[in-house]
């Protein structure tokens, strides 16, 4: 009996057809994502359906339009936790006095925010670190392409595994019990604004002081990395702070305009 693992090189020419259908039918564009990452994620969906080849999966898309939603969810990256890669938040904490001179607030953008853990982490850090005057003028804008992830983020309910980097004191201060999980308190939720945004197709935000876009570029091919980073660079103020994922690198045309804040984290100050 065939299984999804038989989706082999002789059928890989059908992968671009799947991505084309997803784009032209629904407007979701994964065509410039790395093929290796897409194949790994798509194989999970094929296995769940017990579908042997991409060609067979194309037939399913033709017959069942609802499968497009399942495909989209399958290709989205939703792995996150509070204060993931804590060193990045430590370096950002050290930059906050400079960024909030004279009591000004911060405009932070958490791009590709998934289910909201990173955005709420920024809100907690700002609440802990900023003066009341600065905090009152501060807002975290959190965006993602996936409506389902944004719905989860707005609910702000998380299980224990998402809070592994949250100290008991901060857990008590910023969460309250919610069944077998934890819900972010209103004071933190009120600092964050969630919205649907496609980094590939949409205009970026402007005049951003702090920009987190972590572990997304590893799924893009090189031309798309450059295209999207150009948007992020235009969004970030000179002197602003940019955080990328640990496995990601600054595109070469922009590397001279950023200064790394220190070892152990992929976080930079924009200097040019």
List each model region and its residues:
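Conserved AdoMet
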Residues: 2-109
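Short hydrophobic/aromatic beta-strand or adjacent loop that forms the aromatic wall/cage
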Residues: 262-267
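Conserved SAM-binding loop of SAM-dependent methyltransferases across substrates and taxa
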Residues: 115-133
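Conserved beta-strand signature within the Rossmann-like core of class I S-adenosyl-L-methionine
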Residues: 238-246
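Conserved class I S-adenosyl-L-methionine
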Residues: 103-121, 139-141
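A short glycine-rich, Lys/Arg-flanked "PGG" loop and its adjoining helix->strand segment in the class I
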Residues: 226-238
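Extended basic-aromatic, gly/pro-enriched interface segments that bind polyanionic ligands
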Residues: 132-212, 216-227, 249-250, 256-258, ...
